[in-house]
Amino acid sequence: MIDENILREKAQKYIVCFNGECPLHDHCLRWQAGRYLPERLYSVYCFNPNHPGAATDNCPGFRTDQPQRIPRGMVHFYEAMPGKMERAIKARLIERYSRVTYYRYRRGEYPITPDVEQTILQACRDCGWTADPVYDSYNDELVW
């Protein structure tokens, strides 16, 4: 069970869902956060219940309430790569995420979510690096 204080905090600035008919709602962070919205808020961000994918087993807004193994930090990421390849990958990631965000990922300030991890992997493959990326650490975290 997720701490209620975390749900209250996240609910105020998170896209929530109110569709209790969705087959995934029992394990969806968005639905759980929606239950903890403060009454003082007049309006909130929520998913459109009329969207064709809403309330299906393939809901595009679904976020699991189970912690996932999330990498953090890329300080040692390039150690085994040739310098030319390192520069090419770094340039692609900065172009995609901005310099500030790239360095936040690199320092481990931001978790490397599954979609970011896929982008990093694709940048490595596009630049010719075939080994799996190595991150500084891995933590079990919720992916909001």
For each predicted feature, which ranges?
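Alpha-helix N-cap/N′ positions at the starts of helices
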Residues: R8-Q12, R69, M85, Y97, ...
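Short, charged/polar micro-motifs that form catalytic or ligand-binding hotspots
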Residues: F18, R92, Y110
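Short alpha-helical "recognition helix" segments of helix-turn-helix
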Residues: M85-E95, Y102
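Recognition helix of helix-turn-helix/homeodomain-like DNA-binding domains
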Residues: S98-I112
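N-terminal cysteine/histidine-rich coordination modules
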Residues: M1-F62
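DNA major-groove recognition helix of helix-turn-helix/homeodomain DNA-binding modules
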Residues: D115-P133
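Short, charged recognition helix plus adjacent turn
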Residues: D3-A11, Y135-W144
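A short, Lys/Arg-rich alpha-helix, primarily the initiator
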Residues: R63-R87, T130-Y135
